[in-house]
């Protein structure tokens, strides 16, 4: 289960990354997601528990911003369901991995989003 502690750990990890590279980004923290907004695009981290309906959240984000990038952080990733629903995600992170692996994956996605090499 992706609990509140891990959600705030994710928020702190993202803010450290932004501070490290001195990026101009707005960070919005919602109950089950974190949104990073630049002048041209947005990146959404969806952090839901096993019983939540993440398809609904992804489609809600897509309705408001077709070009938004979305990363899903969930346990027990069902790639077939994600593929069949045509969710168009930038990435999926299995939160059952260690925090070090999750942090590495988050950093990789942020590098890609902000074009940092």
Predicted regions: what they are:
Residues 27-43:
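Acidic, metal-coordinating helix/loop segments flanking the phosphotransfer/catalytic sites
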Residues 14-22, 61-62, 106-110:
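Hydrophobic, Leu/Ile/Phe/Ala-enriched alpha-helical segments that form helix-helix packing faces
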Residues 4-30:
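Two-component/phosphorelay signaling modules centered on CheY-like receiver
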Residues 11, 39-70, 76-80:
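Conserved phosphotransfer microenvironments
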Residues 75-79, 83-117:
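Output/docking surface of receiver
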